[in-house]
């Protein structure tokens, strides 16, 4: 009798399994050989040479010399400009190289009128040039006194490493053509108040750039932490939660529908984390649920402030003896951001991560817009979204979902070229959902969480109505 009862229980369990198992489909992703090629093309020796050149300018302080050809931020930015020009010449003029500039004055760290002049290079997309992904590093450097613009400030890791990585990404990616545009930016004025980023973000807003990801690289070369940890196999991705430009109405919606951990920036971070797992050997990325390091800032923030998705990519282990320090030795400790503190292979690894992430997003279609979700007091969940713009290379869409307590997507389903789909017997209350666009070649956009909390597109014309 006990045996028969066991059979009955087993039969009941087996009958219930197909409903659950069929609903929960493991994550699927098409491996892209071109992204493996891009990762392999990044060269540490070129990054080393670029860092050496940037260090050779003595100081790159925002208030430093601008007329000398050998010292100061003026010489540094002119060299970066010419380097972008050389890269463009190697790809048949595929880069539009320009300065982005404004006069800043009356600020705590820029009291007198100063031209804050950044250098950018734009690789225009072939089918959707108005859609952008952006990689940045910071030109300027500093010592202990943020207003000291004459002392040597090599800034080898902070942040010649980020600029060198951006130049190297441009060398590699300029050998390919993408659907969307890629921007490579060397930004000035970071240490004095994030002014280079503010100027470029405002330019993007004025010109209606559809920026879907800003990858700010600020210190990507240090592997020896001040805590004694030495590790070249991990990196951090900082990503804000709730968008800075969220309206009161949107905040109320988020309270009832969720989305505080699924901002566009967080889903860009998840995208980059997936790229690390698939294409960068021996690198594990840590997504940090914070705008930046505790109480600190970086050049992705001005873009976040306007509503653009943006993250900071950087080393895991910082060494504060090598940040914002006068060059000196005290009590046997060597202070200063010198080139001997940079691991060039590690910087190349993080540069490759940027390159494959930029390429994957630029080859993918635009992220879905106006994603909506329904399913309250229902056994199933329905998602809806707008069809991609005409001319987009779209094979269809993929729905992702995960338990509400999980940081990463757990399940996915390609649903074809439709704008509405119902996940049968998946209860809306128990999961977080999102939708990605998929190209004919299998490249995917970042995942979009339903509603305003997860929306990638920005309509600046509606700002006054918020």
Predicted feature descriptions by range:
Residues 423-445:
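Beta-strand-rich modules
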Residues 187-298, 306, 310:
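Metal-dependent peptidase/peptidase-like ectodomains
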Residues 55, 220-241, 287-363:
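Active-site-adjacent mobile loop/cap segments within catalytic or ligand-binding domains
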Residues 38, 46-124:
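A non-catalytic alpha/beta surface segment that caps or lines the substrate-entry region
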Residues 121, 135, 140-141, 145-194, ...:
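Alpha-helical metal-binding/catalytic segments enriched in His/Glu/Asp
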Residues 379-393:
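Conserved aromatic anchor
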Residues 411-418:
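Short beta-strand segments within Ig-like beta-sandwich modules, predominantly Fibronectin type-III
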Residues 440-465:
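Extracellular fibronectin type III
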């Amino acid at each position: 009798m006990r045996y028969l009862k066991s059979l009955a229980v087993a039969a009941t369990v087996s009958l219930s399994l197909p409903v659950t198992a069929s609903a929960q489909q493991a994550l699927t992703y098409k491996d892209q050989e071109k992204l493996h090629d891009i990762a392999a093309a990044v060269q540490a020796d070129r990054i080393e040479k670029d860092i050496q050149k940037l260090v050779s300018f003595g100081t790159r302080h925002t208030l430093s010399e601008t007329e000398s050809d050998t010292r100061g931020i003026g010489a540094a930015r002119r060299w970066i400009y010419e380097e972008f020009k050389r890269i463009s010449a190697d790809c048949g003029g595929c880069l539009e190289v320009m300065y982005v500039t404004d006069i800043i004055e009356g600020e705590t760290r820029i009291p007198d009128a100063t031209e804050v002049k950044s250098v950018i290079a734009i690789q225009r997309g072939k089918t959707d040039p108005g859609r952008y992904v952006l990689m940045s590093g910071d030109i300027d450097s500093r010592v202990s006194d943020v207003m000291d613009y004459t002392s040597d400030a090599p800034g080898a890791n902070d942040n010649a490493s980020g600029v060198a990585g951006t130049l190297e990404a441009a060398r590699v990616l300029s050998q390919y053509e993408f659907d969307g545009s890629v921007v490579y930016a060397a930004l000035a004025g970071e240490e004095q108040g994030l002014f280079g980023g503010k100027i470029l973000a405002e330019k993007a807003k004025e010109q209606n750039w559809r920026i879907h990801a800003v990858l700010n690289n600020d210190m990507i070369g240090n592997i020896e932490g001040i805590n004694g940890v030495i590790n070249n196999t991990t990196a951090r991705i900082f990503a804000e939660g709730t968008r800075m430009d969220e309206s009161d109405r949107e905040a109320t919606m988020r309270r009832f529908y969720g989305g505080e951990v699924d901002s566009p920036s967080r889903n860009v971070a998840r995208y980059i984390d997936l790229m690390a797992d698939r294409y960068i050997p021996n690198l594990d990325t840590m997504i940090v649920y914070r705008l930046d390091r505790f109480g600190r800032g970086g050049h992705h923030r001005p873009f976040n402030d306007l509503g653009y998705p943006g993250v900071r990519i950087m080393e895991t282990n910082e060494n504060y003896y090598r940040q914002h320090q006068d060059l000196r030795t005290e009590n046997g400790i060597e202070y200063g951001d010198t080139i001997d503190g940079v691991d060039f292979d590690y910087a190349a690894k993080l540069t490759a991560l940027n390159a494959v992430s930029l390429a994957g997003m630029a080859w993918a279609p635009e992220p879905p817009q106006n994603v909506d979700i329904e399913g309250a007091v229902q056994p199933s969940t329905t998602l809806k979204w707008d069809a991609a713009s005409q001319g987009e290379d779209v094979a269809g869409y993929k729905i992702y979902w995960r338990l509400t307590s999980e940081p990463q997507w757990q399940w996915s389903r390609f649903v074809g070229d439709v704008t509405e789909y119902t996940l049968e017997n998946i209860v809306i209350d128990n999961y977080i959902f999102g939708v990605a666009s998929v190209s004919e070649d299998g490249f995917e956009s970042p995942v979009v969480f339903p509603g305003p909390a997860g929306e990638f597109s920005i309509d600046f014309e509606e700002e006054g109505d918020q």
